[in-house]
Curated annotation (Swiss-Prot):
Family: Belongs to the bacterial ribosomal protein bL20 family.
Organism whose genome encodes this protein: Mycobacterium marinum (strain ATCC BAA-535 / M)
PANTHER family assigned: 39S RIBOSOMAL PROTEIN L20
Protein name: Large ribosomal subunit protein bL20
Superkingdom per UniProt: Bacteria
Record's function text: Binds directly to 23S ribosomal RNA and is necessary for the in vitro assembly process of the 50S ribosomal subunit. It is not involved in the protein synthesizing functions of that subunit.
Disulphide connectivity of cysteines: none
Keyword rRNA-binding (UniProt): yes
Keyword Ribonucleoprotein in annotation: yes
Molecular function per GO: rRNA binding; structural constituent of ribosome
Amino acid sequence: MARVKRAVNAHKKRRSVLKASKGYRGQRSRLYRKAKEQQLHSLNYAYRDRRARKGEFRKLWISRINAAARANDITYNRLIQGLKAAGVEVDRKNLADIAITDPAAFTALVDVARAALPEDVNAPSGEAA
C-alpha cells in the first residue's frame, strides 16, 4: 500500500485557520491550537448573536415607540391596543421609524388609536370617593 503524506493538506488547513483568526489578540492569532479554539467559540457567538439581534432590535423599537407615545400622553400598551382595535397593521419597526422621522404622522396614528380604544372601566371618575 502506498504511503500517504498529509503535509500539504495540514499546512493548508492551518493556514486557513490562522488567516481567519487574523484580528484576534495575542496567541489566538499566532498559534494554531489557540486560533482553532477561538475560531470555534467565535462562530458559536456569531450564530447565537444573529438570533439575539432580532430581540434586541425589537426592544429598541418598543422603547422608541413608548417614548414617543408618552410624549403624546398615551402608554405603549394602550397605543398598541388602540391600533389593533382600529385595524391599523403597522409593525413595530415601521412605527418606531415613523415616531422618529415624522412626529406629525405618529400623532395622527395616536389619535386613531385613542378613538378606537374602549372606555377604561378602571379609570378614576371625576367624583371624589
